[in-house]
Amino acid sequence: MAGRVKIKQKELIDSTVKNKNVMNLFHEIIGSKGNINFSVVWPKFKKIKQSVYDYISTLSVLEKASVMQNFEDDKKMLELFVQKLWAAYEGYFKYPEIEKYEVEGQVNFNQVPHYVLEKFSQLYRSRINSELVTLILNSCAFLSKYNDYILKKDPYILTITPGLCFSPIPNFEDLNFKYLYNSDKNSQHDKDFIMFILYKLYTAALGVYNAISIPDIDVEDLENIILSSVSQIKKQIPRCKDAFNKIESSVHLLRKNFNTYYSDYVGSGYNPTIIMEQYIKDISQDSKNISPRISYQFRTIIKYYRDMIATKHQTMDPQVLNLVKHVEKKLDMLDREKN
């Protein structure tokens, strides 16, 4: 049954490609025009939400722990800080409108009112890029430098490393784990507990980072769009079989390297063209498999696009133009290497 759903989905994509600009479809799937794939994004959002909850809960456990009775001022400051984090969490991550449609952790988005989905779509990006999530990601970046020690609960970082301060939370340097751990007021049990809290804090922050890194799209949909568009174009451009075969066979690079592409996409400020640029670059750099004949066929395909746009008196999308120039430049480089 699942296979049949995928077949129908591909048939729908094939039909849609015939009637819509491929770059527009790409923008829609990647979500750069405000569209999001709820079946992908909602589970991702829930993972981020759970990990943020775990992070704040860990700090809350520390604040209420008996060990903090020995540090009254620190306890009060931590209590106020945790309250601020919970208030931010409530504001950013409460979406009861969608959650009430969940059945055993799954949502049939066809049954969710459009206005609810529209609201979530509008707020999604700002939520995962919120100050709260950014704080936790920065905390993760700091702690990741001590990954091996923390995961082994090795107190080396709190005892031997130079300096008097080990504060892993941005904007809250008062929470100094090195000071807490090395206090004469603590028993060995207290020290073990503090190290455990640091471990839980790091694993929760890692959970946020890993969830944030999940692509917002179905990579298979993107593959199908590329393959379907090639299928339509190849009928109109004769004697370019090898180049089209190269594109079709290389489409799996998209799946193989997509995590890297997606990281570049996020790092670029959500510029979807980055994904296509890196994908085309990977195809072009496979120089041992690109003969002068295939290079010529790639140029023919590019010329077809330019002629088609010129005939229709259209202005080429600057992003598409950049891709074309990039491919031409890479092909020139490959030609020089082979001569």
UniProtKB/Swiss-Prot annotation:
It comes from the Viruses. It is found in: Host cytoplasm; Host nucleus; Virion. Induction: Expressed in the late phase of the viral replicative cycle. Belongs to the asfivirus H339R family. Disulfide bonds: none annotated. The keyword S-adenosyl-L-methionine does not apply. Its main location: host cell. Keywords: Host cytoplasm, Host nucleus, Host-virus interaction, Late protein, Virion. The keyword Oxidoreductase does not apply. One of its GO terms (cellular component) is host cell cytoplasm. Interacts with NACA (alpha chain of nascent polypeptide-associated complex). This is Protein H339R.
